Amino acid sequence: MNNSMISPSVVDLKAKTGDRYSLVVITSKRARQIIAGEEPLVDIESNKALTIAINEVDQDKIKFDLPIEGIN
């Protein structure tokens, strides 16, 4: 599969979230908030909650904390 055709790219999104796991958790939680009635923070043509959430991450519209590596 050619990821260069996907916008935003998974590589770019991983750079913002740290890893794929965090990307999935962040976007799925935000998608659930949108489904529950929260207003989208971006104006895009899609009405799919996950697509909106992905674009919000890409456009730095949502805040999240990256986990600290290791356990003390």
UniProtKB/Swiss-Prot annotation:
GO terms for biological process: DNA-templated transcription. The keyword Isomerase does not apply. InterPro entries: DNA-dir_RNA_pol_omega, Pol_omega/Rpo6/RPB6, RPB6/omega-like_sf. GO terms for cellular component: DNA-directed RNA polymerase complex. It comes from the Bacteria. It holds the Pfam family RNA_pol_Rpb6. GO terms for molecular function: DNA binding; DNA-directed RNA polymerase activity. NCBIfam families: rpoZ. Promotes RNA polymerase assembly. Latches the N- and C-terminal regions of the beta' subunit thereby facilitating its interaction with the beta and alpha subunits. This is DNA-directed RNA polymerase subunit omega. It comes from Clostridium acetobutylicum (strain ATCC 824 / DSM 792 / JCM 1419 / IAM 19013 / LMG 5710 / NBRC 13948 / NRRL B-527 / VKM B-1787 / 2291 / W). The gene is rpoZ.
